[in-house]
Amino acid sequence: MMTLALVGEKIDRNRFTGEKVENSTFFNCDFSGADLSGTEFIGCQFYDRESQKGCNFSRANLKDAIFKSCDLSMADFRNINALGIEIRHCRAQGSDFRGASFMNMITTRTWFCSAYITNTNLSYANFSKVVLEKCELWENRWMGTQVLGATFSGSDLSGGEFSSFDWRAANVTHCDLTNSELGDLDIRGVDLQGVKLDSYQASLLLERLGIAVMG
């Protein structure tokens, strides 16, 4: 277990592999290409409020990595290997996940995804074209999150806050949306095949179409 305060450092590839790091600050640090598989970060700050910059994790191996109660705002997570990653109770506003892989390819046509991103602020984060199928993605804040071409099919998105969220941009078929604040969801323009809603949400969405729900 270690506690550190690093500024502007390029992180060596194996420096933190499998380690547990608590209550540390990493300002403007470069984790690009680092092996962070199985590494656990608890209560760490990766966002420098003065410069308003996050850390660079691009192309890093984050397989089974854990971030709990961390500030990952504005982090660059492009093209990471993120199979089995856990991001819980974090701030990740404006972070960039384009090209991130949460999947295990078994053959060219069969794969599964694994990720646990929960109780996290994902406002204005970029998940364009990211595949997060059948993953645990509950109780997150998705305000203005960029999801063009993303697929969340079969994932648990329950308890989420989806204000200023473009439902038409992403695949949310077979998702659990119960107990979520659904923002501007218009059921006429979104494929909701297999989606789970609670009765309150269903009546709200029907009322938007001018249908009176009785009882």
From Swiss-Prot:
Pfam families: Pentapeptide, Pentapeptide_4. Belongs to the pentapeptide repeat protein family. Residues 25-104, 117-191 form the Pentapeptide repeat domain. This is Pentapeptide repeat protein QnrB4. The keyword Repeat applies. The keyword Repeat applies. GO terms for biological process: response to antibiotic. Transmembrane segments: none annotated. Keywords: Antibiotic resistance, Plasmid, Repeat. It comes from the Bacteria.
